[in-house]
Amino acid sequence: MEMLQGLLLLLLLSMGGAWASREPLRPRCRPINATLAVEKEGCPVCITVNTTICAGYCPTMMRVLQGVLPPLPQVVCTYRDVRFESIXLPGCPRGVDPMVSFPVALSCRCGPCHRSTSDCGGPNDHPLTCDHPQLSGLLFL
């Protein structure tokens, strides 16, 4: 009986290993296409731009006894390599710099979230919400 249980366990483990080696059920951390709303205080317009951002699944762990042991650091999908592109917002009044920069993800990684450079919160309910009217044209510089 023990031998049969051992063979069954071995069979289940070998099938699980083959299943786990395939493409993950959740997409891993990687650059994806996204549309961002860009506006600036003092300029009466909002422009949407197409860029790449980091998104996807990063494996994390939680302690079972959370009250006894300190929490484990959690990782997020964040930029590894990034460049910034700039656009000129049309219609800005004299004295207001019309240039606005936005990130373009070149590669991503799972790592700690640095609040100084990233939004560490969850997804926004309205990521394309603007305070000003939207324009459809872009001026890349």
From Swiss-Prot:
Keyword check for Glycoprotein: yes
GO biological process: G protein-coupled receptor signaling pathway
One GO location term (cellular component): cytoplasm
GO molecular function, one term: hormone activity
PROSITE patterns xref list: GLYCO_HORMONE_BETA_1 (PS00261), GLYCO_HORMONE_BETA_2 (PS00689)
First and last residue of the signal peptide: 1-20
Annotated glycan sites: 33, 50
The protein's name: Lutropin subunit beta
Originating species: Gorilla gorilla gorilla
Gene field: LHB
